[in-house]
Amino acid sequence: MDTWHDALGGEKQQPYFQEILNAVRQERLSGQIIYPPEADVFNAFRLTAFDRVKVVILGQDPYHGVGQAHGLAFSVRQGVRIPPSLLNIYKELETDIEGFSIPAHGCLTAWAEQGILLLNTVLTVRAGQAHSHALLGWERFTDTVIRQLATHRKHLVFMLWGGYAQQKGRLIDSQNHLILTAPHPSPLSAYRGFFGCRHFSQANSYLSQHGIEPINWKL
């Protein structure tokens, strides 16, 4: 199994998946603003090939502010203000990875292109309404993504931040992969253990131990 089509082609033919796409399409047609833009919904899969995934960072649902979401968890486009959770991720990187300095932007495309799957478990959201698409059925699809990676790939690093993401640990065999857990990097919880978790250096150590080129976290 080498491609997302191999892993997910059958899933995309399922009635529930077509129902999700139709529901989102109908909302857009009715004038509701949905993020990310239609062309960006599956960006994470476009930028990170199935057979090149090294690290999976799970988010919840896309940013719901104007111009923020572009299909990669935690990431925003160039020129958009860095959101607080991402700024805290950068702060942890600054203390964890030698030579990392906080960039002036929040675009994580360079990570995605190195094999970091930046996966939101819900792939769309209404403007200004967090979790508004939580019940559309996206999680059935993204659970399959996690399960397929965990089953058909070896020695991946899964970063599960916050209780919501940590629930997905049940889909992953810890004998074959490294599961790293910590509180969410949001300002509400980062000081409860996200800061100091050193997940980024741990990920690189694990990858190196298994003969896999480590991530260059610098942006």
Swiss-Prot record:
Catalytic activity: Hydrolyzes single-stranded DNA or mismatched double-stranded DNA and polynucleotides, releasing free uracil
Localisation: Cytoplasm
GO cellular component: cytoplasm
Family annotation (Gene3D superfamilies): Uracil-DNA glycosylase-like domain
E.C. numbers: 3.2.2.27
InterPro entries noted in UniProt: UDG_fam1, Ura-DNA_Glyclase_AS, Uracil-DNA_glycosylase-like, Uracil-DNA_glycosylase-like_sf
Domain of life where this protein originates: Bacteria
Assigned keywords, A-Z: Cytoplasm, DNA damage, DNA repair, Hydrolase
Residues annotated as the enzyme's active site: 61 (proton acceptor)
GO biological process per UniProt: base-excision repair, AP site formation via deaminated base removal
GO MF, one annotated term: uracil DNA N-glycosylase activity
Family of the protein in this entry: Belongs to the uracil-DNA glycosylase (UDG) superfamily. UNG family.
Function: Excises uracil residues from the DNA which can arise as a result of misincorporation of dUMP residues by DNA polymerase or due to deamination of cytosine.
PANTHER family assigned to the protein according to its UniProt record, in alphabetical order: URACIL-DNA GLYCOSYLASE
Protein name in the entry: Uracil-DNA glycosylase
